[in-house]
């Protein structure tokens, strides 16, 4: 079969930095104009498939002939620091069925819609406390450190049973792991987090608490369903994903709303639009841009053959701006049906914590703009730094006043 996805004349390098923090990189424009699959080149010169079409993405993310196991020899690496963790499997996200199914079943009860709803009063209390402190301090404020980051950190610590007093440590090690400049730093961050969680698990075995980590120790580790290494891998994933992604959505979501005054005014006038607004922001921002897979068999999709052992990258920011999936995709529209986006992935690896993330975002953004109706940027928008394209997207800092 022919490979029409190769129509892009010269492979675009992947990943690329965004020129605007809430839009896909302009360097991806040829991919947006092309077919659902094209070729891109990675940092090491390797050519892989990139998926940009919405329908093709949902089909492929549901296809178990694409593996998430990064220890496979031909699994794609988008950065050099990825090589630091390639040899070690990641719980849940980096395993395939049936192992993935077993791990997911352990965690599902703690992340249901009902469980997220039960946590809403605690989330609201945490949001109120953080905003009380901001108002008491007075403007200006740096919203990432004062609000966007501590909120999900506090929530995931309470859910897992991890002491929030340790947040400076695990937040800094998470940053090094996700954005460290080289292999040595990433490996050191991984080792530091491992040591911390092994010690915490050993302490909890002697003195159990009431968090999810305690439940996993009692119900899985002590019964031999998982070993300590697997539990540490699960805990690392939950701890990092539980604070890093939501913090970025809150900071970037706030910046985006402040840059779209008409949509913000509509949201303030109709607070009931907030759930739809959060869904649209998830689509519009697409902060996790670059899901990775490798084919274990030949796969035909959208007139293209992906060969066994070929790498596949999902350009989420482009997929969620596909005009075939979303009318006027570059518009921020609270009235569209956006729930079919792939910001949380799709298929068996779809984000386990999405219900909790939605609850945190709805409460955080709704309360922030209600409590601080005069909220505005405290620096020119084009001078506010945001994260590079090879990591989860978000604001590095967000100076605001009111």
From Swiss-Prot:
Record EC number: 1.14.15.11
Pathway of action: Antibiotic biosynthesis; neopentalenolactone biosynthesis
The reaction(s) this protein catalyses: 1-deoxypentalenate + reduced 2[4Fe-4S]-[ferredoxin] + O2 + 2 H(+) = pentalenate + oxidized 2[4Fe-4S]-[ferredoxin] + H2O
Binding site for heme: 351
Gene3D superfamilies assigned: Cytochrome P450 (1.10.630.10)
GO BP terms: antibiotic biosynthetic process; lactone biosynthetic process
Region of interest (Disordered), ranges: 1-28
GO MF: heme binding; iron ion binding; oxidoreductase activity, acting on paired donors, with incorporation or reduction of molecular oxygen, reduced iron-sulfur protein as one donor, and incorporation of one atom of oxygen
A Pfam family per the record: p450
Cofactor: heme
PROSITE patterns linked to this entry: CYTOCHROME_P450
Protein keywords: Antibiotic biosynthesis, Heme, Iron, Metal-binding, Monooxygenase, Oxidoreductase
Catalytic class of the enzyme: oxidoreductase
Similarity section: Belongs to the cytochrome P450 family.
Leftover remarks: S.avermitilis does not produce pentalenolactone itself in vivo but instead a group of new metabolites that are neopentalenolactone derivatives.
Role played: Catalyzes the conversion of 1-deoxypentalenic acid to pentalenic acid in the biosynthesis of neopentalenolactone antibiotic.
Full protein name: Pentalenic acid synthase
Organism: Streptomyces avermitilis (strain ATCC 31267 / DSM 46492 / JCM 5070 / NBRC 14893 / NCIMB 12804 / NRRL 8165 / MA-4680)
Top-level taxonomy: Bacteria, Bacillati, Actinomycetota, Actinomycetes, Kitasatosporales
């Amino acid at each position: 079969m022919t490979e029409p996805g190769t129509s892009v004349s010269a492979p675009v390098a992947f990943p690329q930095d965004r020129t605007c923090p809430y839009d896909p990189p302009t360097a991806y424009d040829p991919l947006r104009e092309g077919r659902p699959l094209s070729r891109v080149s990675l940092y090491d010169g390797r050519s892989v498939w990139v998926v940009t079409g919405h329908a093709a993405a949902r089909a492929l993310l549901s296809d178990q002939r694409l593996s998430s196991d990064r220890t496979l020899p031909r699994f794609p690496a988008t950065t050099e620091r990825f090589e630091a963790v390639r040899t070690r499997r990641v719980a849940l996200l980096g395993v395939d069925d049936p192992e993935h199914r077993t791990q997911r079943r352990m965690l599902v009860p703690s992340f249901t819609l009902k469980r997220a709803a039960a946590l809403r009063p605690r989330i609201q209390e945490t949001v109120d406390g953080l905003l009380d402190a901001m108002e008491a301090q007075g403007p200006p404020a740096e919203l990432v450190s004062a609000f966007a980051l501590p909120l999900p950190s506090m929530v995931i610590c309470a859910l897992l049973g991890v002491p929030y007093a340790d947040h400076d440590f695990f937040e800094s090690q998470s940053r090094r792991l996700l954005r460290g400049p080289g292999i040595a730093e990433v490996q050191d961050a991984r080792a530091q987090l491992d040591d911390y969680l092994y010690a915490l698990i050993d302490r909890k075995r002697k003195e159990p608490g009431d968090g999810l980590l305690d439940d996993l120790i009692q119900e899985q580790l002590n019964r031999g369903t998982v070993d300590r290494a697997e539990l540490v891998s699960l805990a690392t994933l939950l701890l990092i994903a539980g604070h890093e992604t939501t913090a970025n959505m809150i900071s970037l979501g706030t910046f985006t709303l402040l840059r779209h005054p008409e949509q913000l005014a509509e949201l303030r006038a109709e607070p009931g639009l907030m759930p739809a607004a959060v869904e649209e922001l998830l689509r519009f921002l697409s902060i996790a841009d670059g899901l990775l897979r490798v084919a274990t068999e030949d796969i035909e999709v959208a007139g293209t053959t992906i060969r066994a052992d070929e790498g596949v990258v999902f350009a989420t920011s482009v997929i969620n701006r596909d005009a075939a999936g979303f009318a006027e995709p570059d518009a921020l529209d609270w009235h569209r049906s956006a729930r079919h986006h792939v910001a949380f992935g799709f298929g068996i690896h779809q984000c386990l914590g999405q219900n909790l993330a939605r609850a945190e975002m709805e409460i955080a953004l709704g309360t922030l703009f209600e409590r601080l109706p005069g909220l505005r940027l405290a620096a020119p928008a084009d001078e506010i730094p945001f994260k590079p394209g090879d990591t989860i997207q978000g604001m590095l800092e967000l100076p605001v006043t009111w």
